[in-house]
C-alpha cells in the first residue's frame, strides 16, 4: 500500500504513535488510508452540508474496509464575493486549493482520495491537485440546490435576485417585492440551481470520468444523492486496493475533448473554458482555443438551462441527467471518445448504455437541437488576438452579430455605478478593462454589471466585452476572457470612448474599427495600468498569472 510509507516497519513507530493519538487502532493502521478531501464551510450554501456528507462517506469507507482520514480546504462563495473587492480572490483561490491538495497528499501518504467539492473554483482546484499527485481519486460533489419559487409560482434562482436589484433601482419593483425574491430564490443547501459554473464543472467531472454518473444532477437534499455518496465511498476503497485507475489514466486528451463536447451540448458556463484548460495543463495535455472552436462547430446545443432558459438542474435530472445528454450526442458518429476510461472501471460509453432522454422539452433530441453548433464560442480578431469567449447559448438572436460605440469603464465597480446611473444606452458596447488575471488582479466575474443591463431591459440592445470573466449565471451578449488583457498590452487597453466595435458570433470574430496606423499611434503612448492591491497573495498571483487563453494558471518556476 502507498500508505506503508508512513505506517509500515519499526522505523515508523513514531509516525504510528502520532496516528494513534488521533484515535487509530491496529485495525485502522492495517487498512488502506482513504483521504477525504472536504471543502465544508458555513459560508457557501453549496458547502454548508458537506460535513454531513463527509460523515456519511467516512462511515461507508469503514464498512468497505478502508480507514478514512479527513482534511479540509478553503472555498470562496462567488455570489457573496460578487460586486466588491472579494471577487479578486475567487479565481486565485483555485490555485490555492490545487496547492493545498498537493501539499496534503505529498506530506502524508494515502492510498486513495475522495474529493467532496461543490462550487465554482473548488471543483477544478481539487482536480488540478489530484492530477499533480496522481493517486486513485474519485469525486462526489455536494449536489445542486433546488430552484426557488416566487409567491406567484415563478421559478427563481440567485440570478433572479441580481436582476431584481436593477429593476428596483429603475423603479419597476418595490422594496417589499425585492425582499420577497431575496427570501425565496435560494431555498436550501446545494450549488446554485442553474447551469452556472459550479453545476457545469460538476457535470464535466462526470464526463471527464472522475465522478460516477449522477454527480452533476442529483439534488443535494435527495435520498438518491445519499446513495450516490455511499456508492462513491465503496468505489474509492476498491480503487485503493487495486491502485487504480489513476487520475492521469483518466484525464487524457480524449477526456478533455469529451468534456468540451458535452459542454457545448449543454450550454455550460464560459468559466469551464478557463478551468478545463487549467485541468488539461496539469494532466500534461497541450490544448488550445482553436480546438475548442472546432468542437463547438460540430456539436449541437441540445440542452439549455438557466440562465439560458426557464429550466434548472432539477429538470435536467428529471430528463435523464448528464448521462442522457452524453447518450444523445453519442448518436453522432465520432463526436465522443466512448472508449475513454472512467473511475467506475467502465468506459464512458458503457456508463450511459440505455440512458435515453426522459423529457424532450428539457433535453432536445438531435433532430430538434437549439442550434447546430455548441453553446460556447471562441472569438478572434484584433481585439482578441489570442481569443475571447462567449456563451452563445445565452445570447439573444438579435445580438449574434453587433456593431456599436464603446462606452469604457476602467473597472467593474466603475461599470456598476455607470450602468445604474444610466450612462449606457441602447446600441452601446460596454467595455470593462483592467480586470484580467494580472490587471485586476484576479479576473473578477461580471455578474453585477451584466445583471444590471438585463434588469434595465437592455439585454437585447447592449453588448459587453471585458478582459475579465463572467459568472455562470450571466446571460446576454457578454464576451469575456479577452486575451491579451489590457495589463499586458492588449488592444482593449487602447480603446477610447466612441470607438466602433463589431463582432460576429457565427463568424467567430471580434474587432475594433481602427486603422493599423491609429493603433500604432495609440500603442506608442500606452503605459501598463494595474489596479493597486495591498494583498500579498494577489500581488504574487499578478506576478505569476498567465492570461485567460492559457487558463489563467500560475507560471511554474524552473
UniProtKB/Swiss-Prot annotation:
MF (Gene Ontology): 2 iron, 2 sulfur cluster binding; dihydroxy-acid dehydratase activity; magnesium ion binding
One cellular component term from this protein's GO annotations in UniProt: cytosol
Binding site residues for Mg(2+): 78, 120-121, 445
Assigned keywords, A-Z: 2Fe-2S, Amino-acid biosynthesis, Branched-chain amino acid biosynthesis, Iron, Iron-sulfur, Lyase, Magnesium, Metal-binding
Superkingdom: Bacteria
Any one GO biological process: isoleucine biosynthetic process
Pathway(s) this gene product operates in, as recorded in its UniProt entry: Amino-acid biosynthesis; L-isoleucine biosynthesis; L-isoleucine from 2-oxobutanoate: step 3/4; Amino-acid biosynthesis; L-valine biosynthesis; L-valine from pyruvate: step 3/4
Residues forming the catalytic site: 471 (proton acceptor)
Modified sites of kind N6-carboxylysine: 121
Keyword ATP-binding: no
Entry-linked InterPro entries: Dihydro-acid_dehy_C, DihydroxyA_deHydtase, DiOHA_6PGluconate_deHydtase_CS, ILV_EDD_C, ILV_EDD_N, IlvD/EDD_N
Note describing how the cofactor binds: Binds 1 [2Fe-2S] cluster per subunit. This cluster acts as a Lewis acid cofactor.
Cofactors named for this entry: [2Fe-2S] cluster; Mg(2+)
A Pfam family this chain is assigned to: ILV_EDD_C
Quaternary context: Homodimer.
Matches recorded under HAMAP family: IlvD
Family recorded in the similarity comment: Belongs to the IlvD/Edd family.
Protein's job: Functions in the biosynthesis of branched-chain amino acids. Catalyzes the dehydration of (2R,3R)-2,3-dihydroxy-3-methylpentanoate (2,3-dihydroxy-3-methylvalerate) into 2-oxo-3-methylpentanoate (2-oxo-3-methylvalerate) and of (2R)-2,3-dihydroxy-3-methylbutanoate (2,3-dihydroxyisovalerate) into 2-oxo-3-methylbutanoate (2-oxoisovalerate), the penultimate precursor to L-isoleucine and L-valine, respectively.
Protein's recorded name: Dihydroxy-acid dehydratase
Gene coding for it: ilvD
Amino acid at each position: 500500500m502507498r500508505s506503508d510509507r508512513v505506517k509500515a516497519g519499526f522505523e515508523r513507530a513514531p509516525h504510528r504513535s502520532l496516528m494513534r493519538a488521533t484515535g487509530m487502532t491496529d485495525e485502522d493502521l492495517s487498512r488502506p488510508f482513504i483521504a477525504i478531501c472536504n471543502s465544508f464551510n458555513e459560508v457557501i450554501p453549496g458547502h454548508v452540508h458537506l460535513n454531513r456528507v463527509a460523515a456519511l462517506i467516512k462511515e461507508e469507507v469503514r464498512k468497505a474496509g478502508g480507514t478514512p482520514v479527513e482534511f479540509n480546504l478553503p472555498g470562496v462563495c462567488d455570489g457573496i464575493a460578487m460586486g466588491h473587492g472579494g471577487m479578486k480572490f475567487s479565481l486565485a483561490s483555485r490555485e490555492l486549493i490545487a496547492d493545498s491538495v498537493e501539499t496534503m497528499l505529498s506530506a502524508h501518504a494515502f492510498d486513495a482520495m475522495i474529493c467532496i467539492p461543490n462550487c465554482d473554483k473548488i471543483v477544478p482546484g481539487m482536480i488540478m491537485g489530484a492530477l499533480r499527485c496522481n493517486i486513485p481519486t474519485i469525486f462526489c460533489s455536494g449536489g445542486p440546490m433546488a430552484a426557488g419559487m416566487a409567491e406567484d409560482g415563478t421559478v427563481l434562482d440567485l440570478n433572479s435576485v441580481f436582476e431584481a436589484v436593477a429593476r428596483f433601482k429603475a423603479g419597476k419593483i418595490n422594496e417589499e417585492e425585492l425582499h420577497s425574491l431575496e427570501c425565496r430564490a435560494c431555498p436550501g443547501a446545494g450549488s446554485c440551481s442553474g447551469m452556472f459554473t459550479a453545476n457545469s464543472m460538476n457535470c464535466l467531472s462526470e464526463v471527464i470520468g472522475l465522478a460516477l454518473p449522477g454527480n452533476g444532477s442529483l439534488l443535494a437534499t435527495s435520498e438518491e444523492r445519499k446513495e450516490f455518496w455511499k456508492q462513491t465511498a465503496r468505489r474509492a476503497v476498491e480503487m485503493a486496493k487495486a491502485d487504480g485507475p489513476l487520475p492521469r489514466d483518466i484525464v487524457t486528451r480524449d477526456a478533455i475533448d469529451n468534456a468540451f463536447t458535452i459542454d457545448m451540448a449543454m450550454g455550460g458556463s464560459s468559466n469551464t473554458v478557463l478551468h478545463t484548460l487549467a485541468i488539461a495543463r496539469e494532466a500534461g495535455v497541450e490544448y488550445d482555443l482553436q480546438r475548442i472552436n472546432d468542437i463547438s462547430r460540430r456539436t449541437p446545443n441540445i440542452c439549455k438551462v438557466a440562465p439560458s432558459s426557464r429550466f434548472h438542474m432539477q429538470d435536467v435530472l428529471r430528463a435523464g441527467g448528464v448521462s442522457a445528454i452524453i447518450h444523445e450526442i453519442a448518436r453522432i458518429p465520432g463526436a465522443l471518445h466512448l472508449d475513454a476510461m472512467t473511475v467506475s472501471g467502465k468506459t464512458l460509453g458503457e456508463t450511459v448504455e440505455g440512458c435515453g432522454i426522459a423529457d424532450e422539452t428539457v433535453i432536445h433530441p438531435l433532430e430538434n437541437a437549439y442550434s447546430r453548433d455548441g453553446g460556447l464560442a471562441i472569438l478572434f480578431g484584433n481585439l482578441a488576438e489570442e481569443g475571447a469567449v462567449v456563451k452563445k447559448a445565452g445570447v439573444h438572436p438579435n445580438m449574434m452579430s453587433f456593431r456599436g460605440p464603446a462606452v469604457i469603464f476602467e473597472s467593474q465597480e466603475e461599470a456598476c455605478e455607470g450602468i445604474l446611473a444610466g450612462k449606457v444606452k441602447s446600441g452601446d458596447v460596454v467595455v470593462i478593462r483592467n480586470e484580467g488575471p494580472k490587471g485586476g488582479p484576479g479576473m473578477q466575474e461580471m455578474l453585477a454589471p451584466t445583471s444590471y443591463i438585463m434588469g434595465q431591459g437592455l439585454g437585447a440592445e447592449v453588448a459587453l466585452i471585458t478582459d475579465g470573466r463572467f459568472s455562470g449565471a450571466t446571460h446576454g451578449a457578454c464576451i469575456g476572457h479577452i486575451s491579451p488583457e489590457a495589463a499586458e498590452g492588449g488592444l482593449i487597453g487602447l480603446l477610447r470612448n466612441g470607438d466602433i466595435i463589431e463582432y460576429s458570433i457565427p463568424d467567430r470574430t471580434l474587432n475594433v474599427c481602427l486603422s493599423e496606423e491609429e493603433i500604432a499611434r495609440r500603442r506608442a503612448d500606452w503605459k501598463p495600468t494595474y489596479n493597486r492591491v495591498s494583498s500579498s497573495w494577489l500581488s504574487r498571483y499578478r506576478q505569476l498569472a498567465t492570461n485567460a487563453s492559457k487558463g489563467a494558471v500560475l507560471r511554474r518556476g524552473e
